[in-house]
Amino acid sequence: PYEEIQTHEKILKDVLKKVDKNAELTIAGSYRRKVSDSGDIDVLLKSDDKTVYTRFVKMLSKEEYLIDDLAFGRKKYNGVSKLEGGVGRRIDIMYTTPQEYPFAILYFTGSKDFNLMMRQVANDKGYTLNEYNIEKYSSDKKNRVKNIIDPEGEKIKVEKDIFEFLEMEYREPCDRL
């Protein structure tokens, strides 16, 4: 439930502050879309320091917030978290750099249908869009341009910039059905 995820969010942010005061996290997925019933917890961890991700997951385990590990990869953790007295919840923690973050938050907020629509708009304009970047489509990988520059010459820095680049009206997460 939404209220329970709010409690998870507070715990996660408190632990992250102990690990690195400069790192940030956002709970994405259905929680960010304000859906009343969230089955799992999708956490995006943003930092310039790649070691923050590993230290964060280890600290969550040490504090017995994470009760079961399903997978612990280079950039993504899958496991089970549990509040004191609560039930186990599936949790995914994804590490992202600040440069990848706008694309990651767009993708992991969803919904699946909304992501498919955004990718189709990008394709129709000659681009490929994924959770890492947007590229000018080219069958020759050497000629792909990563993290597209917008018309004013600024890199895409926030989620809204992706909508603007694709000439789309920004949609709040709760409107991404």
Give residue ranges: language-model regions.
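A short linear-motif detector with a strong N-terminal bias
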Residues: 4-6, 21-25, 58-59
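Hydrophobic alpha-helical scaffolding
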Residues: 1-6, 46, 108, 152
